[in-house]
Amino acid sequence: MSVGVWAVIPAAGRGVRFGSPVPKQYLPVVGRPLIVYTLEALAAHPAVCGLMVVVAEGDLAWSSWTEVAGKPLLTCSGGVTRAASVLSGLLALPQVVHADDFVLVHDAARPNVALSDLERLLEAGCAHPVGAILAVPVRDTLKRAGADGSIDGTEPRERLWRAFTPQLFRRSQLVRGLQVAAADGIEITDEAMVMERQGLRPLLVECAESNFKITTPDDLVRFEFELARRV
């Protein structure tokens, strides 16, 4: 993988679902903010040449880092939604990032992406006409619930995947799609959805389950366990 890419990390969320007074991306994990692990995991790949972190307006928790692993680390202010923050980050990328360049978008609270998974995403995504996302096939049995909470049926899972990040797409296509979705009042839940709305079909690249997102306190405990295994 020789093509250099920038990564956009939306980190303007307040972590309301987590239930902490501190946004979860800044929660201390073994003495360091959670987001530091995320940034280091991305910067560890030689093809990642810079990172753009999108923070909330007036964010006092951000420590004004300017580099990670010797790579430039820039910041900009985000929006009310994740999609708005991603758009802000894409528009704020430096001039060295061209319209047709591939860009990674990665959750700030997903600190455990494996270098091997990142490598496979970049290899497959940059060779694909649209791009690619990391994902995990659904392996559990899925039940459809009725309005009263009882089971209405069982859903086939053979072609269902759980979307993870990073997600890799061309900058111009993401910008255009996010702008159109905002104008149409569409709630965007991930970058692949932006491509789908343009009639495009991104590639699914399977990754490890350990690339989970920190959403609950139990997830944080799980990540601390993963860190202990590295020692």
From Swiss-Prot:
Keywords: Isoprene biosynthesis, Nucleotidyltransferase, Transferase. GO terms for biological process: isopentenyl diphosphate biosynthetic process, methylerythritol 4-phosphate pathway. GO terms for molecular function: 2-C-methyl-D-erythritol 4-phosphate cytidylyltransferase activity. It is an enzyme of class 2 (transferase). It holds the Pfam family IspD. The record marks 17, 24 as: Transition state stabilizer. It catalyses: 2-C-methyl-D-erythritol 4-phosphate + CTP + H(+) = 4-CDP-2-C-methyl-D-erythritol + diphosphate. Its EC number is 2.7.7.60. The record marks 157, 213 as: Positions MEP for the nucleophilic attack. It comes from the Bacteria. Pathway: Isoprenoid biosynthesis; isopentenyl diphosphate biosynthesis via DXP pathway; isopentenyl diphosphate from 1-deoxy-D-xylulose 5-phosphate: step 2/6. The keyword Nucleotidyltransferase applies. InterPro entries: IspD (IPR001228), IspD/TarI (IPR034683), IspD/TarI_cytidylyltransf_bact (IPR050088), ISPD_synthase_CS (IPR018294), Nucleotide-diphossugar_trans (IPR029044). Disulfide bonds: none annotated. Belongs to the IspD/TarI cytidylyltransferase family. IspD subfamily. HAMAP family: IspD (MF_00108). Catalyzes the formation of 4-diphosphocytidyl-2-C-methyl-D-erythritol from CTP and 2-C-methyl-D-erythritol 4-phosphate (MEP). This is 2-C-methyl-D-erythritol 4-phosphate cytidylyltransferase. The gene is ispD.
